[in-house]
Swiss-Prot record:
This is UvrABC system protein A. Residues 1-11 have a biased composition (Polar residues). The UvrABC repair system catalyzes the recognition and processing of DNA lesions. UvrA is an ATPase and a DNA-binding protein. A damage recognition complex composed of 2 UvrA and 2 UvrB subunits scans DNA for abnormalities. When the presence of a lesion has been verified by UvrB, the UvrA molecules dissociate. Residues 1-30 are annotated as: Disordered. Its main location: cytoplasm. ATP binds at residues 62-69, 692-699. GO terms for molecular function: ATP binding; ATP hydrolysis activity; DNA binding; excinuclease ABC activity; zinc ion binding. InterPro entries: AAA+_ATPase (IPR003593), ABC_transporter-like_ATP-bd (IPR003439), ABC_transporter-like_CS (IPR017871), ATP_grasp_subdomain_1 (IPR013815), P-loop_NTPase (IPR027417), UvrA (IPR004602), UvrA_DNA-bd (IPR041552), UvrA_inter (IPR041102). Residues 360-639, 659-988 form the ABC transporter domain.
Length: 992
């Protein structure tokens, strides 16, 4: 997989920077219209020489693990990036990521390079589809310039207030009300404001960040801190006869503060919110709810006199990353963590003494303390600590969860056996968890407390992220939050159909053009079902990649080398055509595209095809074909050519399994996201494919509803399923297994051997060798995670990090163990001539042959080979595995577990990253699971898998609001006859 996880732009010079070796005799090809690679040896590449045309769409294909990504990303793109970085100053390089020099003799014809891979854009909860495409930035500008503010209280459009109207409102204050007339010249801006203080030096007093100061002796402000400065224009007490003075003061303040004036009621003492100090705006109320400040605007205010004044609308007002626009409750996140009682009390059969309250049962000292406190509460309320939680009264359970406002008497014996008593308040377990979560500085403790919480929409903004004032600024009748919730196609219709006045049209014309152009690109890559408020962290790898692709098209760059990693992942066949047209448009602008791809349609449209093989891993790394599609089909050495020409194929099953009558799962009334009260039956004991165009509701139905219900009921999980009425038929199942594409580990110490458990058996075998027995070595000696057998110089990592100050950190092999991870004594123990480090470095297929005599080991390894991972090294770090590889490692691990035929396996696009031949192997594994009586339920777009299924559930007919219904169910042949099914149309062609 590519090393660079984000869209990276790098310039690469035509000449060979860094003194790369030339070809034989120093000759150069001199071909300006081609990219030439000579002597590529990265990873499993075997001294590869290849050339292909520029300004063309070039597809790199081949079996999974054959070396496609090693050539495309780790060699060609990496060299382009390295040349660009080396052209920068050492100071600039300090801020860039580490760039490895690929193992290649030379590359010629490189252009500035852009890598667009499948890694998610980022996990920042503040990033959305709108922000990463920059559409939201243009929307903020549009709403700020032509939006019509409305009063949050009455909904009326706000209007401007005259000085006379402001004075009239102030005169309604009670007699003898003392207040100051302030001119807010600075509101929540960073700076020292030295010049401003100099200009105001004769104005008397000012309120600076809540403190009254003399302007003749102003404070020194911190430049990087936001400040609020208001000139004190007048101090008044409301009484008869001050109208003229009040009018003069208001007019003076309005002039000083550009149309703003604030009345500060000096007798109101605001109640400070714990831990917060807000100096960015005028706020605060006393215990009775009376405001300390009241703002007035000469520009915008409510016609009905509601005291909440709308400030001047600016683009920053619509940013949920800015305190002026963000919802004050959730600070712009749109959600908040809340303790869930169901997670706090995991088992209501237990009593308090038995640990029903999980947060108070973590460790003996914690448990003993809270049992004493709960004992005091029990005495006060009359319940026993031995009563099961479910048998406590509602009031008693509520007291334990939420606390009581009275004191409880706690009795305990000290270490001398003497009885002691004291009284204490009882805050309850939910306030306790919330308090500890807010106070802790430990990441581990924070994660522990968050395990008792669920994320819920913010109750103040209902997930809109913005404050009420901003949410009442409307364009075309919609707030900016409402507009971000529209699916892309509806958003396109909304913005293109906006009715604006001539003046508004003149202001908004250019902004609307930018918004519509970006929306059009997103539609072109098949993302019409997404909306702009969708968090970036929830996007699949394919969706994130296509968003970046759309952004690049919008940039209009020419002469660029784009390197893409399977852009068709997650796309239905219907949407694939539009994606290919988008790629061709990018090429026609004058760019070169290298597309790592298995999709047959994309390969067919390529200008040039490079097939890497002939097999995977150690048996690949060669260029099997470089040229046209016709020549590839004729190449009998190419496995890809065999499938494209029809010499090999994945056959339609001779017979399909017939579901046993009555043995079904039934989901009723599914209504989450775009599902429209869907009810569907999932037959058990068969292979079922869930299909439909992107955004039709497949993942919502299976992952968000069905799987979570099954996990809760069968596995004892505490997940929150999507909205539905019921799920029936669970009595037919004992276990659910969810095999997704999340990593098998987040450190290099995790690998296929450790995840599947085969490493335990291998270590045990090494411990049983004669040499190990003589030395007294136990199984733990062969672990690189604990002291004893590992190399202590690198703590079992095999590498050492060298800090280079202004240069990136360099990772070098450990000088003691030379990357083997183990010490010399451990490596002296061998089995069949191989030590433990050499075994971990074997491809899994080779290791399976090596350990063939030991069934316990070979059974694990054969399963990994069966799922198409024979090329992966046994000890390959988890961080280097792709999502598809990680998913297949998990599948192999599950295949090792004994099954009674009552297990349902839920998979989400298991064919991701797989070649035709690998899909054939995967299907064999899935069919073998079903042959044992289990159920396999897979979300899938791949037609070879769909045609091999026993049962198909097709959702649609479209994505987003146009989907969410069941279009067809039945065998692939029955779905192929469904007129409304897009999947059926493609199946019909395949089954004909």
């Amino acid at each position: 997989m590519p090393k660079n996880s984000s869209t990276t732009v790098s310039s690469a010079v035509e000449a060979h920077a860094g003194g790369l070796a030339s070809g034989p005799g120093g000759a150069r090809s001199g071909e300006r219209d081609r990219i030439v690679v000579q002597g590529a040896r990265e990873h499993n590449l075997k001294d590869v020489d290849v050339s292909f045309p520029r300004d063309a769409m070039v597809v790199f294909t081949g079996l999974s693990g054959s070396g496609k990504s090693s050539l495309a990303f780790d060699t060609i793109f990496a060299e382009g990036q390295r040349r660009y970085v080396e052209s920068l100053s050492s100071y600039a390089r300090m801020f860039l990521g580490r760039v490895d020099k690929p193992d290649v003799d030379f590359i010629e014809g490189l252009s500035p390079a852009v890598s667009i891979d499948q890694k998610s854009t980022n996990r920042n909860p503040r990033s959305t589809v709108g922000t990463i495409t920059e559409i939201y930035d243009y929307m903020r500008l549009l709403w700020a310039r032509v939006g019509v503010p409305h009063c949050p209280q009455c909904g009326e459009p706000v209007s401007r207030q005259t000085p006379q109207q402001i004075v009239d409102q102030l005169e309604e204050l009670p007699e003898r009300t003392r207040f100051q007339v302030l001119a807010p010249v600075v509101r929540g801006r960073k700076g020292e404001f030295v010049d401003l203080f100099r200009d105001l030096s004769t104005q008397g007093f000012a309120v600076v960040d809540g403190e009254t100061v003399q302007l003749s002796d102003p404070p020194v402000l911190k430049k990087q801190v936001k400040h609020t400065i208001a000139v004190v224009v007048d101090r008044l007490a409301m009484k008869e006869g001050i109208r003229q003075r009040l009018t003069d003061s208001v007019e003076t303040a309005l002039k000083l503060a550009d149309g703003l004036v604030v009345a500060e009621f000096v007798d109101v003492e605001p109640v400070a919110e714990k831990g917060k100090k807000n100096t960015a705006e005028f706020g605060g109320r006393d215990a009775e709810g009376n405001p300390r400040y009241r703002s007035f605007s000469e520009k915008l205010s409510c016609p009905n006199g509601h005291e909440q004044t709308v400030d001047e609308i600016e683009p920053r007002s619509f940013s949920f990353n800015n305190p002026f626009g963000a919802c004050p409750e959730c600070t712009g996140i749109g959600s908040r963590l809340q303790v869930d009682p169901d997670l706090v009390v995991a088992n209501d059969e237990l009593s308090l003494r038995e640990g029903a309250v999980v947060p108070w049962s973590l460790g003996k000292s914690t448990s003993d303390y809270w049992l004493r406190v709960l004992g005091g509460l029990g005495k006060e309320m009359g319940f026993s600590l031995d009563t099961p939680w479910k048998d406590l009264t509602e009031a008693e359970r509520d007291a334990v969860l939420h606390g009581k406002d009275f004191k409880v008497e706690v009795t305990f014996r000290n270490r001398f056996g003497r009885e002691r008593r004291y009284t204490t308040g009882f805050e309850g377990v939910i306030p306790y968890v919330m308090r500890k979560h807010g106070e802790t500085e430990s990441d581990g403790a924070r994660e522990r407390y968050e395990s008792f919480m669920r994320e819920i929409p913010c109750p103040a903004c209902h997930g809109a992220r913005l404050n009420p004032t901003v949410l009442n600024v409307l364009v075309g009748g919609l707030s900016i939050a409402d507009a971000t919730r529209l699916p892309m196609r509806e958003a396109m219709e909304f913005f293109s159909g906006l009715r604006l006045t001539d003046r508004e049209r003149q202001i908004a014309d250019q902004v609307l053009k930018e918004i519509l152009a970006r929306l059009a690109f997103l539609l072109d890559v098949g993302l019409e079902y997404l909306n702009l408020e969708r968090p970036a962290g929830t996007l699949s790898g394919g969706e994130a990649q296509r968003i970046r692709l759309a952004t690049q098209i919008g940039s209009g760059l020419v002469g660029v080398l784009y390197v893409l990693d399977e852009p068709s992942i997650g796309l239905h066949q219907r949407d694939n055509r539009r994606l290919i047209e988008t790629l061709l448009r990018l090429r026609d602008l004058g760019n070169t595209l290298i597309v790592v791809e298995h999709d047959e349609d994309t390969i067919a449209e390529a200008d040039w095809i490079v097939d890497i093989g002939p097999r995977a891993g150690e048996y690949g790394g060669e260029v099997v074909h470089s040229g046209s599609l016709a020549d590839l089909k004729a190449n009998t050495r190419s496995v890809t050519g065999d499938y494209l020409s029809g010499r090999r194929s994945i056959a339609v099953p001779e017979r399909r399994r017939v579901p046993e009558k009555g043995r079904v799962l039934t989901v009723r009334g599914a209504q989450e996201n775009n599902l429209k009260d869907v009810s569907v039956q999932v037959p058990l004991g068969v292979l079922t494919a869930v299909t439909g165009v992107s955004g039709s509701g497949k993942s919502t139905l299976i992952n968000e509803i069905l799987y979570k219900v099954l996990a809760n009921r069968l596995n004892g999980a505490k997940l929150v399923p999507g909205r539905h009425r019921s799920v029936e038929g669970l009595e037919h199942l004992d276990k659910v297994v969810h095999v997704d594409q999340s990593p098998i580990g987040r450190t290099p110490r995790s690998n296929p051997a450790t995840y599947t458990g085969v490493f335990d058996a291998i270590r045990k075998l090494f411990a049983e060798t004669p040499e190990a027995k003589v030395r007294g070595y136990q199984q733990g000696r062969f672990s690189f995670n604990i002291k004893g057998g590992r190399c202590e110089a690198c703590a079992g990592d095999g590498t050492l990090k060298i800090e280079m100050n202004f240069l990136p950190d360099v990772y070098v092999p450990c000088e003691v163990c030379h990357g083997a991870r183990y010490n010399r004594e451990t490596l002296e123990v061998t089995y069949k001539g191989k030590n433990i480090a050499e075994v971990l470095d074997m491809p899994i297929e080779e290791a399976a042959d090596f350990f063939s005599a030991y069934t316990r080991i070979s059974r694990y390894l054969d399963t990994l080979v069966d799922v198409g991972l024979g090329y992966v090294r046994l000890g390959q770090p988890a961080t280097t595995l792709s999502g598809g590889e990680a998913q297949r490692v998990k599948l192999a691990a599950e295949l090792q577990k004994r099954s009674n035929g009552r297990t349902i396996y839920v998979l989400d696009e298991p064919t991701t990253g797989l070649h035709f031949d690998d899909i054939r192997k995967l299907l064999h594994v899935l069919q073998s699971l079903v042959d044992k009586g289990n159920t396999v339920l897979t979300i899938e777009h791949n037609l070879d898998v769909i045609k091999s299924a026993d049962h198909v559930i097709d959702l649609g007919p479209e994505g987003g609001s146009g989907g969410g219904t069941i279009v067809a169910t039945g065998t692939p042949e029955e779905v192929a006859r469904a007129a409304e099914s897009h999947t059926g149309r493609f199946l019909a062609e395949l089954l004909a």
